[in-house]
Amino acid sequence: MRGKRFKKTANSFMKNVVILICSQLLIKVLGLIYKLVITNIEGFGDTGLGYYSAGYQIYSLLLTLSSIGIPSVISKLVSERIAIGDTKGAQRIFKVAFRFFTTLGLVLSIGLYFGSDFIATNILNVPDVAYVMKVLSPAIVFVAMSAVFRGYFSGQQNMKPTSVSQTLEQFLNCVLSITFVYACIGKDTYIMAAAGNLSTTFAIVLTFIYLFIYYKKRKLDTSKSIESPEKNKTNKQLLKTILGISIPITVSSLISVISGVIDTATVSNCMQIAYSGIESSKEALEQIAMSATGILSKVDTLVSFPLAINLAFSTALVPAISEALAKKDKETASRRLSFSFFASLIIVLPCAIGFISLAQPILSMIYPTASDGAGVFQIASVSMILTALSQTMTGGLYGVNQSKIPAIAAGIGAVIKFILNMILISNPNINIYGASISSFVYQVIVFIICYRVLNSHVNMHIKLKTHIIKPVISAVGMGIIVYMGYNIIHMFLGNTISTLLAICLGAISYVLLILFTKTLSKEDIMMIPYGTKIYSFLVKFKIYKEVKEPLR
């Protein structure tokens, strides 16, 4: 009976994960396409990408204040109310949150518009970035409202509107970015960057309209709601509850975003310091700083692919664990968390090793006119492993009401990162690599703190041989095959074909190595959609032996 119940909840959890993975993959592909196109447009390049991302980082900082913590919080509170049948309470949580965060988003939108000149001139030391921030400012209020909708639907274990809206937003952003930047060819680079970011605002407004229409058609049915003690809370008390959970999450996310802002500000200033003895022109120094910022942005775009897949586990984990704990089902919560941690490692390890093995070929293939940054890419790929695992553990910590821990961990990491950035980037022999090195140290700190706390609350059942050593052996073996394969193929074919064939070779070899090492148990395979059919196929071809005993 317990096995059947777990299998049912596992299937529901994995269904949401698969929906989010498909959505996130499509979003990242679209994001890569438009960044690839605009980066290779004449007059844009790494410098244009630097202006583009510098303004976007400041925008992201305010965006985090107004919206980043909202989906997780609303999702958690709504799922807890629905789990006990209190649909009226769930609906009330949505309404209180919507009013407050709409107001907050509006205030921050106005603040960014009128404060952009000061930030660009006095903090970033690149005045022209102000244009990018101004065109992004109206988007903040619409993102805040959209975030409440997404949390509301996520709390109902309905990931469809979140997936569709995010995909729609990125599609519109992709089409409009390319269109607007092309329309500005011949103008100054910062104008082209501002035009590219203007598309983000248009896309977000249209996405909000979609979510609003969906909400009007799919509101919760409150006619059969069960009364709970929550009904006696005033709106002020309810808002206090929402903020009590959302503030630690927001602070954690804010510090993570600050990590990016630290890079933007310190790279912009420290690169100018590092090269001040080589270049005397202020304009030339700004161009060097923006080019370095562009390289970081370019690398972030690539490493975000595996992280987007992994984020699906983290996002689905919050309501899944909250629901299980609300029902006093610690076993299910533990299994979901353990599987998500293991799955994160299985997904991100081969990607990291593949990126390290093919760093320069990948950059040359995707950014033929701006292919610098292979070393930065390799260091970021190592950090990506820890980032992915920290994402999953953060979702678990939110689910077990330990939302302050990621904030504390990120805060400690951010302070150390800032100090390292100032020391390393200002050294002309290290320069931009300093940002990647400090990011790695930052992720190590966050990972260690989050893991220790989460494991003390929920037994994660991490087995060294099965969950760590076997995936590492498979990923390293794949990396060797990919590296050798690329170099052999490249003797006869060009870079693009050689890189694509090496990636295909890597994917096939990794799957075979995973099967050969028996990294996935029967229970792991059963968690995957169509797991029963996959396992039967593996048994039929004697890759796995039939296991008769029931699931634990």
Stretches found by the model and what they are:
Residues V143-S165, V382-I412:
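Membrane-interface junctions at transmembrane-helix termini in multi-pass inner-membrane proteins
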Residues D117-L136, M290, G354-M384:
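Interfacial segments at transmembrane-helix termini and the short loops linking adjacent helices
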Residues M1-R2, F180-C184, F202-K231, F440-H490, ...:
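C-terminal transmembrane helix end/exit motif
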Residues I68-A83, V299, V303-K327, L337:
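Helix-loop junctions and terminal segments of transmembrane helices
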Residues M1-I33, K88, R92, E230-S256, ...:
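N-terminal membrane topogenesis motif
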Residues K160, F171-I209, K404, A414-I448, ...:
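Membrane-interface helix-loop junctions in multi-pass transport and translocation proteins
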